[in-house]
Amino acid sequence: MIKRNPSQQRAIAHLSGPMMVLAGPGSGKTSVIVERTAYMINEGGISPSNILVVTFSRAAAKEMKERFLSFTGQQYTPVTFGTFHGVFYGILKQAYGFTAANILSDEEKFGILRELTLNYGGDLAEEGDFPEEIAREISVVKGNKIALEHYYSSCCPDEVFRQIYQGYREACQSRRKLDFDDMILYCYELFVQRKDILEAWQKKFQYILVDEFQDINQLQYDIVRMLAKPQNNLFIVGDDDQSIYHFRGARPEIMLNFTRDYPDAETVTLDVNYRCSGQILSAAMHVIGENKKRFSKKLSTPNQVGKAVQIREFQNPR
């Protein structure tokens, strides 16, 4: 077994209560999540069926599960590894009997949006990328629980956006279809309306681990908080310095305010970068240090030798 550094070992051995792990690239965060999951089962006596490990992409969830099975020498595990959409859709399937036929395809989604744009948007229908832009804004509104009257569109007049948004929601509901954001939204509404169902899933997922936490949006966070009650065995892993998906609705301030929401949360920084040279790490820390809304960190690397960092200037982002 690979020997872990003190910060990694502290995170792995954390059993109960909230913890925030600040983990930059090359810090071994995936290994920490995998080994902590195994530690909870083998050393903490926690039932694997009560553990939820959730991340943002199917590829990441698949890799996490495969690494856990390899680490434990198993071919199967009752631990739930999944994405937010996959886990929450599974909850909806049990509650409402949804099937794959209820999932809105991209073709259907953009067909609805193009038709609504023709009805309400006039000349906007001639802009080839408009359906993608308004789909992104609809996702932001849903994912962050923004009241429609308080959202100001950047891709069309506000009244046009509201008409298209309402028309899109009505079209999905009349067809009994869910888009990806509805999987999250409907799960939130289900838990708010049905405390008995929420309590059943709280008993199921008594220990929750969330990877890439800096990319979470408000709705996802609200559901995670509901699920984690009453024990609040919530273990979040992320890097506030890598939050780049604000345009998709990510709310990096959620991570920055985590200890406000959970005053008793422990915080661990995985402070050794095993991937970069000393030159790269020093340059990166100098640049990101200009960001004032971040957790201050002191990172080191055993890889001190490397090429000097080059600075190049280009005329455009492409």
Indicate residue ranges for each PLM-predicted region.
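P-loop NTPase Walker
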Residues: 1-99, 199, 253, 282-285
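Proline-centered turn/helix-capping motifs that create local helix->coil transitions or kinks
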Residues: 126, 143-146, 231-232, 287-297
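ATP-hydrolysis module of ASCE/P-loop NTPase motor domains
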Residues: 15, 76-78, 96-182, 205, ...
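Conserved AAA+ ATPase "sensor/coupling" helix adjacent to the nucleotide-binding pocket
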Residues: 68, 115-119, 283-291
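Conserved helicase NTPase motor core
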Residues: 1-13, 17-21, 52, 60, ...
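Conserved catalytic network of the ASCE P-loop NTPase/AAA+ motor domain
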Residues: 43-48, 72-74, 200-201, 216, ...
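Switch/connector loops and helix/strand junctions flanking conserved nucleotide-binding motifs
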Residues: 60-64, 87-92, 243-246, 276-282, ...
